[in-house]
Amino acid sequence: MKRFSFLIMLLFSTVVLAQKVVDKALIKTQTEIVFPENPGGSAAAPGGGDGERGMNFGGMSGLDLTSTIYFKGDMTKIESTSDFGNNITITDRKNRKTTTLMEMMGKKMGFYSTDEDEKTMKARQDSIRAKRTDSLQKMGINVAPPAAPEIIYTEETKKIAGYNCKKAIIKTKNRQGEVSETTIWYNPEFKMAEGFSMNAGGGMGRAMMGGGLNGMDQINGFPMEYDVQRSNGMKVHMVVTKIQLDATIDDKIFEIPKGYDIKPMSEMGGPGGGGRVFRMGGEN
């Protein structure tokens, strides 16, 4: 029995060691987003966790995004193109700074944020959420803390961008007790190094690689495709169309382009000056 257990542990260790850690990559993705008919739905409740509060989509039903992701060491850059406009997010993990650039309706603008800005904004949001939860509990409405995500690995496989991928399901439950499932197709052969930022840019930038999905960072591999539906009706489908590992990427790729009016995140609109409110059409 001990010999059998040792062999199992040895086999598991071999699999873990065989998983490649990638510190340079060029990734192309296609993301389809279907906006909710009612942006102020159940996701707006305290702890909904869907992150779509306060969004104004200007009557648009959806958005298709074509993105190119450059990753090298501590730097991640996401270039996204859609009918709405162009978007660039550059994340510098070494200096703990993220710059988001937008080109829409002939205007070039952007904002930058630091890790401290993110912590301050999160603390403010947590405080607002706690006050709302307290108000509901005083009304006799129980709001439970969000449960840890449950990841179910399956043996289903399919090929994506030339790679054999496996299927996993992430089950999450929000504070209202609503259960949602996200289907992930991942490649178990490699993961990105620690410097890779799945949260680049927040909002739509986050949606590219699922950085906003609870449990995504726990997947034992690299996400190649996912489908998610929020409790307010918002849907996101992302698929990797091309991936080049150990790509040759010039450092100039990560330089901030000229011609943009860039401000600190604290001066941008949205709750707490966070620059996170994503408005599609209409006035700010």
List the predicted regions and their residue ranges.
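Extended soluble regions of mature proteins
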Residues: K20-N284
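Bacterial Sec-dependent N-terminal signal peptides
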Residues: M1-V22, F278
